[in-house]
Regions:
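Conserved N-terminal alpha-helix of the aminotransferase class I/II PLP-enzyme fold
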Residues: 59-60, 65-107, 300
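Active-site PLP attachment segment
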Residues: 215, 221-257
């Protein structure tokens, strides 16, 4: 064996310092800010649209599940991780959304990775919207399918990509509600094109469930597409339902295939019982209080009016400020005044479109909404 010779080469991770400095200079450094459990701050940065994350009924659902099943699942869904609670949530979630079947994953991210990789692969085509969430982008990359990225909500471009395909199988993939701008995908038109071209439409309803459609059943339900035999949906349990986890909904043949083929289902520890219990309790609250989604949209319209932007068809209000420094400073001013808002900078959004993202909540009191409006008027564009 040759002797080890020490060199004057830099440390193999020294490049991280230069990258961090470039990010700092561009106003793109991110940091973790632990929050106190009862800070006197109104949160418009998270995704707890229905205000169920701290609802006593939802918390009780988590506590009861922990007492009955324990704090963790102890294994994957195929080993020890599937409890009767998981099955109940899947059954009730599918029924609520109008799907034949549902399969719960440990996160919405894992659900997207699992469904796209399992339904595509080499020899398949994925047509993906340019504004899709990072989890869908990563799923396309990992799928080994040929991926064509089309302009946001461009149905003609989707049709052209499908018409030119040589692959036997094809998927069209989109968010139902864009997570940054809050606009809706033209699902009815996308479904018509997909069906005509023999493709499956895969829709991420992360920001649709609990907010859009009849009683919060999602954009697919609003467009009359819930339960269609050539549509697959994914949802998250961590936004409107105030818990954690994700699920795939669609034909029973699809979820059965995922049990055999979705690596993020097979090899991942199952969603923990407290999260399942909380999600199930939140779903039942939503079923018992079908007016909650309309209240979210009312609050979103109020926030948009105050911020000087158009009212969105969802809970997401986007206020574009341009530079990352302007967005960061505005978010900090709002926080200092007692209102936490989202600050989106590249790479989360394109260059020159850094923005504040405000997320509406159904549980805001009149006094809280008045306070928010006052802060937005004074602090967003001082």
């Amino acid at each position: 064996m040759s002797p080890v010779v020490e060199t004057a080469d830099p440390h193999p991770l020294s490049w991280l310092d230069a990258v961090a400095e470039r990010r700092r200079a561009a106003g793109l450094r991110r940091e973790l800010r632990p929050r106190a459990p009862s800070a006197d701050v109104i949160d418009l940065a998270g995704n707890d649209y229905l205000g169920l994350g701290r609802d006593e009924r939802v918390v009780d659902g988590a506590v009861e599940a922990a007492r009955t099943w324990g704090a963790g699942s102890t294994g994957s869904r195929l080993v020890t991780g599937t409890t009767q609670l998981h099955s109940t949530l899947e059954r009730e979630l599918a029924a609520f959304c109008g799907a034949e079947s549902a399969l719960v994953f440990s996160s919405g991210y894992a659900a997207n990775l699992g469904v796209l990789t399992a339904l595509s692969g080499p020899g398949a085509l994925i047509v993906s919207d340019a504004a899709n969430h990072a989890s869908l982008v990563d799923a396309c990359r990992l799928s080994r399918a040929r991926t064509v990225v089309v302009p946001h909500n461009d149905v003609a471009a989707v049709d052209a990509a499908l018409a030119a395909r040589t692959e036997e199988r094809a998927l069209v993939v989109t968010d139902s509600v864009n997570s940054v701008d809050g606009d809706l995908a033209p699902l009815r038109e996308l479904h018509a094109v997909s069906r005509a071209r023999g493709a499956v439409l895969v829709v991420d309803e992360a920001h649709g469930l609990g907010v859009a459609g009849p009683g919060g059943r999602g954009v697919l339900a609003a467009e009359g597409l819930a339960g269609a035999d050539d549509v697959v949906a994914t949802v998250t349990l961590s936004k409107a339902l105030g818990s954690q986890g994700g699920a795939v909904l669609g034909p029973a043949a699809v979820t059965a295939h995922l049990v055999d083929a979705a690596r993020t289902f097979i090899f991942d520890t199952a969603l923990n019982p407290p999260a399942v219990g909380a999600a199930l309790a939140a779903l039942r609250v939503l079923m018992d209080e079908p007016a909650l989604p309309a209240e979210v949209l009312r609050v979103a319209a109020e926030l948009a009016r105050t911020a000087g932007v158009a009212a969105p068809p969802s809970a997401v209000v986007s206020v574009v400020l341009g530079s990352p420094v302007l967005a960061y400073e505005a978010a900090q001013r709002c926080l200092d005044a007692g209102v936490r808002v989202g600050c989106f900078r590249p790479p989360s959004v394109p260059e020159g479109t850094s923005r504040l993202r405000l997320t509406a909540r159904a549980d805001l009191t009149g006094a809280e909404l008045d306070r928010v409006r006052d802060v937005l008027r004074r602090k967003v564009r001082p």
